[in-house]
Design a protein with these regions (language model features):
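N-terminal auxiliary segments of SAM/dcSAM-dependent transferases
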Residues: 1-49
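A short SAM/SAH-binding and catalytic strip from SAM-dependent methyltransferases
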Residues: 158-166
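A short, charged helix-loop
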Residues: 49-59
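Conserved SAM/SAH cofactor-binding pocket of Class I
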Residues: 61, 65-145
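Conserved beta-strand segments that form the floor/walls of ligand-binding pockets within enzyme
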Residues: 38, 56-58, 116, 165
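A short acidic, Gly/Pro-enriched loop at the edge of an enzyme's catalytic core
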Residues: 146-159
């Protein structure tokens, strides 16, 4: 510290009571309301607000808990599109947690192809679809962009979601 002209930090040692830090952290995530969507974690034990579509997503290994402004913007865009009529076949490219694909599946009860380059994200998206009771509508696959033929063979997508940095 003295080499760069700052005070040395104070270091203390002690014993702390055991605590479930994962549960504590989950409780800190407040539900998010965007358009028709209400994004909440598994710790939310209250009723959904009237006329809202619930999306249960816990913050974790995959991107997309609803906290980031780009995710909120994408959910708002899906809400806007939903006001203009039904969609039948959706693609969520770079799905992360699957939040956008799940929003499509729950809004239109339509089939959704979800893809991500990260295998852990695909597993999280599949589990989130199961928890949200839409696993029958969702196919989540590991793919580097459009390389997997199942994406190209999925037919015409009438809505494509991609909350990614490219």
């Amino acid at each position: 510290a003295s080499a760069v002209g700052v005070d040395a930090p104070v270091v203390t040692f002690g014993t702390y009571e055991p605590k479930d830090w994962v549960s504590e952290n989950l409780r800190s995530f407040k539900p998010i309301s965007v358009g028709r969507f209400f994004v909440h974690g598994s710790h939310w034990d209250e009723d959904l607000p009237v006329a809202k579509i619930g999306l249960q997503v816990d913050a974790g290994l995959a991107f997309g808990s609803g906290e980031h402004q780009t995710t909120k913007g994408c959910l708002a865009a899906i809400d806007w599109v939903a006001k203009r009529g039904p969609r039948h076949n959706a693609l969520d490219m770079g799905c992360g947690s699957g939040i956008l694909g799940m929003a499509c599946a729950k809004t239109w009860r339509s089939t959704v192809m979800m893809a991500d380059i990260d295998a852990a994200s695909v597993r999280v998206a599949q589990e989130n679809a199961r928890v949200n009771k839409i696993a029958d509508l969702v196919t989540a696959i590991h793919s580097n962009g459009f390389q997997d033929t199942r994406i190209r063979d999925g037919g015409y997508y009438d809505i494509v979601c991609a909350n990614i940095l490219a």
